[in-house]
Amino acid sequence: MANPNEQAAQSLQTSKVIIAVNTPNGVGYFVDSEGRFLFKKQFEGVSKFTEGLACVKQNDKWGFINTQGEVVIPCIYDGARNFSEGLARVKQNRKWGFINTKGEVVIPCIYDKMSSLFLTGFSDGLARVEQNGKWGFINTKGRVVAPCIYDDARDFSEGLAYVKQNDKCGFINTQGDVVVPCIYDGA
């Protein structure tokens, strides 16, 4: 979702700076480096451009525009995050999933929660997801790498992720294999 502060991004397509501005009264718009409005349309919220697209909010729903200000992914989502590695996290009917830059669903909106990582939620190519109060991990194609069986989990760092099961801590690798069993009181 949009940050209430100004966000700047270098547009790869136009080689000019596009600044996303969100005002306290719920108006979002884009300006160039000299403060000139870039698009006629204003939104309820905006985010910076990543991979040539920016999140925009219209009628309380999120979608994406290109660097010409054209809506290329309709504003149909309850929430959205910026693109990274060709994917954007989106929310529909209180569930999270991922779409690609064409607006195609890559990972269906079936997860209650996702990693808190700012952009898409992927770390070491995996996203932490929650279903029915349990955590697991999926890859960028939506394949379950570690099933949602953990009471708690943290994002991957250097190939390992902290997991907790039955009040005991351990670690799994990026293949979902347990490398340190959940037998420890803390990590």
Predicted regions and their residues:
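Residue-level detector of conserved, function-critical positions
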Residues: A2-A187
